[in-house]
């Protein structure tokens, strides 16, 4: 029978597994000269893939509203978010994930400002429906992955890189993520979307697509930065 949805395993909700799964797909499809682009948690997968497997075959990397480099506040990462915030999220998901999703998607789209202007009630509801249909195990297990430390992974990113982030992102604040990611990758280009929430791929799709087209169509040469250095 054809597979119409993803499986819902009880283990493997970590970035090493995500990156390994992506690597298997790359090898199976014999991909070469491809772009790795990730949104939100997906940006962490891009970083971990590069950290584990390098850039062979990868021409560009794109991070959109992404969680790297390291969201957790620690002694050597004072720019991060207090751990109690993530613990509170886990507690809320465990107690009533459906109620949590309602508040989450309000901040995902900044509905208090953008509902009826850049996002419809139906689009927000569709996102809630998708989240509600996800594995309860995955919904809970993914929260700690939000504050994975990707700093060593980003150090291995040696391809032209684009970072796109909204300056009004309430889920993954730009100051703790996008701005720092761009500063850690030599030559990375940062595009800040004015008034953009977390889901700029929906609310500000035109701006995101324009940035992607300009970046990917610019004819960047993978080795250019290495030679320049």
What are these regions (language model features)?
Residues 1-41, 50-52, 57, 210:
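Active-site loop/oxyanion-hole signature of alpha/beta-hydrolase fold enzymes
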Residues 26-32, 157, 215, 219:
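Glycine-rich phosphate-binding loop signature in dinucleotide/nucleotide-binding domains
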Residues 47-95:
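Flexible "cap/lid" loop of the alpha/beta hydrolase fold
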Residues 69-81, 91-155:
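Conserved alpha/beta-hydrolase catalytic His-Asp/Glu region
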Residues 157, 163-165, 169:
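Short beta-strand/loop motif that positions the catalytic acidic residue
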Residues 167-170, 195-197:
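Acidic beta-to-alpha connecting loop that harbors the catalytic carboxylate
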Residues 170-176:
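Conserved alpha/beta-hydrolase "acid-adjacent" motif
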Residues 186-229:
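Catalytic active-site module of serine/aspartate enzymes centered on a nucleophile-bearing elbow/loop
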């Amino acid at each position: 029978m054809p597979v119409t949805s993803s499986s819902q395993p009880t283990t493997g909700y970590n970035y090493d597994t995500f990156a390994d799964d992506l690597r298997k797909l790359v090898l199976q499809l014999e991909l070469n000269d491809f772009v790795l682009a990730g949104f939100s948690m997906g940006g962490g997968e891009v970083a971990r893939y590069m950290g584990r497997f390098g850039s062979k075959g990868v021409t560009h990397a794109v991070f959109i509203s992404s969680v790297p480099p390291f969201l957790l506040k620690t002694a050597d990462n004072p720019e991060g978010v207090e751990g109690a915030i993530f613990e509170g999220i886990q507690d809320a998901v465990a107690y009533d994930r459906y109620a949590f999703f309602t508040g989450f998607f309000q901040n995902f789209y900044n509905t208090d400002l953008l509902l009826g202007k850049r996002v419809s009630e139906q689009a927000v509801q569709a996102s809630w429906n998708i989240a509600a249909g996800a594995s309860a195990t995955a919904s809970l297990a993914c929260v700690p992955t939000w504050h994975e430390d990707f700093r060593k992974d980003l150090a291995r990113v040696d391809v032209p890189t684009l970072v796109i982030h909204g300056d009004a992102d309430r889920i993954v604040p730009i100051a703790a993520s996008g701005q720092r990611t761009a500063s850690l990758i030599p030559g990375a280009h940062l595009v800040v979307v004015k008034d953009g929430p977390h889901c700029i791929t929906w609310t500000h799709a035109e701006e995101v697509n324009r940035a992607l087209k300009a970046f990917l169509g610019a004819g960047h040469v993978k080795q250019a930065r290495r030679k320049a250095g």
